[in-house]
């Protein structure tokens, strides 16, 4: 069995058509997450208002500020590749946010169970964002968009941290408090 190095295989198989198609996919994904982040800026205040535990409220409030920065970073990423920042509806995020609204309406206000539901919804969103930014970072690197790749890498780390913080809030307090209600 013969193997070629990654670099050799990439150089030998890269065609202008394939690169153009990959760039189009990359831009579509970028527009998708741009829409998602803009809508998260609108949705996170509802989660903050619905939360009971102060630690959860603070965690989401901090992430709201980060999310606003993510929108700005995405605008910088668009600019760095010579594209206009244009959101395109993200069906996945739309579904996740709809589910979050349903969880809020199906749980009693002021309960730890609602906090568990908020953490669950928040982590689903974080996992979607982690997947999206990981993909964008890899595609940006492949396409030679190093500035955009660096922006996505920074956001990816923040999304991983947000997910970890939600886990800590759940494990350190909220889940046990919900069982005791």
Feature locations, PLM:
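Amphipathic alpha-helical hairpins
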Residues: 1-181
């Amino acid at each position: 069995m013969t193997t070629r190095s990654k670099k050799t295989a990439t150089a030998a198989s890269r065609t202008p058509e394939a690169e153009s198609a990959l760039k189009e996919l990359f831009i579509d994904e970028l527009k998708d997450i741009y829409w998602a982040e803009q809508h998260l800026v609108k949705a996170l205040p509802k989660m903050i208002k619905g939360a009971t535990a102060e630690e959860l409220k603070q965690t989401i409030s901090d992430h709201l500020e980060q999310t606003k920065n993510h929108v700005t970073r995405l605008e910088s990423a668009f600019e760095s590749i010579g594209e206009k920042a244009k959101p395109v509806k993200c069906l996945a995020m739309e579904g996740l946010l709809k589910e979050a609204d349903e969880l809020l309406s199906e749980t009693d206000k002021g309960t730890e169970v609602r906090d568990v539901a908020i953490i669950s919804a928040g982590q689903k969103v974080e996992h979607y964002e982690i997947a999206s930014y990981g993909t964008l970072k890899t595609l940006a690197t492949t396409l030679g968009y190093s500035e955009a790749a660096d922006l996505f890498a920074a956001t990816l780390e923040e999304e991983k941290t947000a997910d970890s913080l939600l886990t800590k809030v759940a494990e350190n307090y909220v889940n046990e408090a919900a069982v005791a209600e």
